[in-house]
Amino acid sequence: MIRSPLRYPGGKSRVVEKIVALLPPFSEFREPFVGGGSVFIHLRQKFPDRKFWINDKYTELIAFWRELQSNSDNLIAQIWAWKRDFNDGKQLRRFLQANIENFSSLETAAAFFVFNRITFSGTTEAGGFSEQAFRLRFTDSSIERLTKMPEVLRDVKITNLDYEELINVPGEDVFLFLDPPYFSATSSALYGKNGKLHKNFDHERFAANLKKCPHRWLLTYDDSPFVRELFSFANIVSWNLMYGMRNVTENSKQLGSELLITNFDFESNAPLFSIHDLRFTIHE
């Protein structure tokens, strides 16, 4: 099974199968905050004949997914060229930061991937340079893995819209998986330029929109009284997850209590999976 080529803060790569076991049947899958795309990539391979629509407000991230889908050979060639030309990770990062405003879409996508591999926890423009990540994450094998992705992305709809578009567009047997910017202060600057996509997220508007959503959905969120109150109209279960953060030491991880929230019944959609298993700590 092909996995996401991206390192992503709060990504669900280690718990994909547990999340997938909870999903109801669907004909169309939409992911409004695709990020690293772990759940999408897993489902795309499991159900290759179904419709998939992925989206994110993060423009550089979507440039990466689009170029990987339609222009992968040139994208990979650009990444190889920068890896060959720069032996010093800090110099590479300075070069990209100094020139990114004038980059083409292809170069922007390639720069996004490089930032993802060489910054703390893959936080791209919002994260500081990590020498350890440069040495251990920006590897030949990390680039080679990109060659497997175009087939996964074939015929997938990829957009750079506000999440509300995906929630409201009519469709038959649609299911949405949502992993939005989290509410807690420890997760407030994870991605986007200066972390703005986390800092400026309107959680009240988000809850109000989901309450009106005509499709079935499953949502992951950090646990707090505020979030529980916002989604008091839905089904909520807690779980624990270990995740890396850029605002702690490079080798440390922080335990976070999270929520799975749905507008459908958990148990009826997971006959082979106990929802109570989610209450155990999962290491990511």
Protein language model annotation of sequence segments:
Residues F52, I158, I236-S238:
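Conserved beta-strand scaffold positions in the cores of enzyme catalytic domains, especially
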Residues M1-V15, L22, Q69-Y191, F201-D202, ...:
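SAM-dependent nucleic-acid methyltransferase catalytic core
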Residues F26-F29, D49-K51, L153-K157, L210-W217:
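Short active-site oxyanion
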Residues L197-H283:
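Long, positively charged, glycine-interspersed low-complexity recognition regions
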Residues G35-S38, R145, Y221-P225:
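Short, polar loop motifs at secondary-structure junctions
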Residues G35, W65, F113, W217, ...:
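A residue-level signal for conserved active-site and pocket-lining positions in enzyme catalytic cores
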Residues A21, P25-L96:
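SAM cofactor-binding core of SAM-dependent methyltransferases
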Residues P5, G11, V15, P25-F29, ...:
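Conserved N-terminal glycine/acidic-rich loop preference
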